[in-house]
Amino acid sequence: MDKSGSPNASRTSRRRRPRRGSRSASGADAGLRALTQQMLRLNKTLAIGRPTLNHPTFVGSESCKPGYTFTSITLKPPEIEKGSYFGRRLSLPDSVTDYDKKLVSRIQIRINPLPKFDSTVWVTVRKVPSSSDLSVAAISAMFGDGNSPVLVYQYAASGVQANNKLLYDLSEMRADIGDMRKYAVLVYSKDDKLEKDEIVLHVDVEHQRIPISRMLPT
């Protein structure tokens, strides 16, 4: 008797037929596995550059140089008339200035626009000798001499610009923490009056690590 026509044989034959979409599903699985491997490799690569206790992140965007950390200070410019200027010298905390011979590698300024911001400002950081003042005329000349980078930050109808950082490299100057009192942040309000509640400036000073007291205050 020929069993090929039996119900069991028919069911076996049906099971052995490739189901529709099995090949495309297999391809999708392979693609997913490949993507997973790529993500794992990327994650491993990124983990190498992630900050650690001994290698902190400088300004939340890149790692400090080995052996360095950073100190942040906040500046709130006052009201600045259209076409006028503002300058303020850097003032680091006493806990940092106590180690005035520690080298400084970079200064970074971050502009944080507040909800009312609708202006155009120019921002820079400059070494200003203690004998020099921060008058409007003096600051105007510093903006025009081209001796330091200038960040132009402005309001746009679609939102404020993404680039809000200015990086000033001091590594070749061998500047130290004690020199920071000779540096000043300068602001120029170009197109209109800058109100005092329009921007906040965050200044990050990357410097060599300083000793940390392990004793609790008594």
From Swiss-Prot:
SUPFAM superfamilies, alphabetized: Positive stranded ssRNA viruses
GO function terms (MF aspect): RNA binding; structural molecule activity
Span of the signal peptide: none
Classification via InterPro entries: Cucumovirus_coat (IPR000247), Cucumovirus_coat_Asu_sf (IPR037137)
Highest taxon in the source lineage: Viruses
Pfam hit, one: Cucumo_coat
Record field: compositional bias (Basic residues): 12-22
Location of the protein in the cell: Virion
Keyword entries, A-Z: Acetylation, Capsid protein, Ribonucleoprotein, RNA-binding, T=3 icosahedral capsid protein, Viral nucleoprotein, Virion
Positions of the UniProt region annotated as Disordered: 1-30
Cellular component terms per the entry's GO annotation: ribonucleoprotein complex; T=3 icosahedral viral capsid; viral nucleocapsid
Residues annotated with N-acetylmethionine modification: 1
Family, similarity comment: Belongs to the cucumovirus capsid protein family.
Domain remark text: The N-terminal arginine-rich stretch does not seem to be the major RNA-binding region that allows formation of an infectious ribonucleoprotein complex.
Function according to Swiss-Prot or TrEMBL: Capsid protein. Probably binds RNA and plays a role in packaging.
Protein name: Capsid protein
Species annotation: Cucumber mosaic virus (strain Q)
